[in-house]
Regions:
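Short aromatic-glycine-(Arg/Gly/Cys) micro-motifs in beta-strand/loop hairpins
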Residues: 1-17
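N-terminal regions of proteins, emphasizing targeting and processing segments when present
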Residues: 10-12, 25, 38
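Generic detection of short hydrophobic beta-strand segments and adjacent strand-loop junctions
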Residues: 19-21
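Short, mixed-charge low-complexity intrinsically disordered segments
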Residues: 35-50
Length: 50
C-alpha cells in the first residue's frame, strides 16, 4: 500500500485541493476520490510517496 498525493477539483470549486490517499494503486486512489467528490471530479498532478 502506498500514499498518493493528488490534486483534485470539481467544476464547483474555485481552486485545486491536495488530497492524501492510501491505496494499492493510483486508479484505486482516484476511484476513492470520485466517490468522495462525485463523478465530475478531475485530477491534476499526482505523486506516490512511500
Amino acid at each position: 500500500m502506498m500514499t498518493y498525493i493528488i490534486e483534485v477539483a470539481t467544476p464547483a470549486m474555485s481552486f485545486w485541493e491536495l488530497e492524501k490517499v492510501r491505496a494499492n494503486s493510483l486508479d484505486e486512489a482516484k476511484s476513492f476520490l470520485v466517490e468522495r467528490y462525485g463523478k465530475d471530479a478531475f485530477f491534476g498532478y499526482s505523486k506516490a510517496v512511500y
